[in-house]
Amino acid sequence: GKNQLVYSFPVDDDGKVELPGMKDDAEYDKPFRINPENTLVMARGIGSTVKTGNLSWRVACLNLENQGYTLINSVICHDICNDKWYNQIVFQQNDIHTPNTVLVRHSEGAEDAAKRLGNKFPMILKTAVGSRGVGVIWIESLKSLHSTIQLLHREDEFVDVLLQEYIKTNYDVRVIIASGKILGAIKRPVIGDDFRSNVSQGSEPESHELTEREAQESLRAAASV
């Protein structure tokens, strides 16, 4: 039925779940039941259709969603946002402004991809799946583009690689939106002489007051996913 039995496990100081073992005498909370009428599910890292990883979590969330549970965010939203190329396609369909982006399927396509971006180096190379600034690479020439794509495909022949125009900026902005309303925004300054602004790479976020255009574009982007 729609009522689900939920088990909870403690988390250690490093944020890792402590799963029970054969000799583990740790005490765990008793399982409890949830139902769609009184439960809000907040899911993180549910897996991707591109990379299996913890895909079982995605299936579990999809099952809950099909039974009427409310997820933040929805499974389809996770699917779109976990894949930068999928995200790019959805934004294009909804006329959301983004940097010019090309999918590069193999190293032989590097020259054509660079041409489509006007051969304006530097450019930014990204793996379609990734976070925390990992897999985001600064490309200064066609030669380095070709060799970098070769290396990525040697490590994973099925990896999707995106080539993107470089837009010089001192920061980026993250906006928190729920139910079509803006709850807040942070500015993430670029790190030193790096080109990335990820907090996990050392950027120190600060509060940010959105311009009217930033607010409207953020709301449109959120609505599209």
Segments and roles (model prediction):
Residues 1-2, 180:
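Internal hydrophobic scaffold segments of catalytic domains
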Residues 2-100:
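Conserved N-proximal alpha/beta basic substrate-recognition cap immediately N-terminal to
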Residues 32-33, 62-63, 114-115, 152-153, ...:
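Short secondary-structure boundary/capping segments
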Residues 44, 104, 188:
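Conserved residues at the C-terminal ends of beta-strands
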Residues 67, 76-162, 170, 212-213:
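Active-site nucleotide/adenylate-binding loops and adjacent lid/helix of ATP-dependent enzymes
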Residues 134-221:
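Phosphate-binding site of ATP-dependent enzymes
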Residues 224-225:
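C-terminal beta-sandwich/jelly-roll accessory domains of carbohydrate-active enzymes
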